[in-house]
Amino acid sequence: MTKDELKQRICESVDRRRSQIEGIGDQIMVNPELGFKEFETAKLVANTMEEFGFQTETGLARTGVKAVLKGKNPGPTVALIGELDSLGVADHPMVNPETGAAHACGHNAQI
């Protein structure tokens, strides 16, 4: 498979799951959690990755999630990182009244 064919396959896969991906992003947006307190977000990420067939490891650096998808052949390995913590900004229009947090930094756009 060429690089362009792989890119096309990935784009098609994302397009097929568009509503699910948007729903996850919306769920994270309305449930902001401060850094090292993203327990519900970590559960959501781990559960979603498991639904996609990844093996997950949770509790890394408190709320981190590692997801691994083994291929049929060895290598190459691709690594991605994402941050989904929010900020304590009490005056943000989408602040969570319970936590005082909001996704005001753009991390949630990684979804």
Specify the residue positions occupied by each region the protein language model found.
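Acidic/His- and Gly-rich active-site-bordering loop/insert found
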Residues: K3-A104, A109-I111
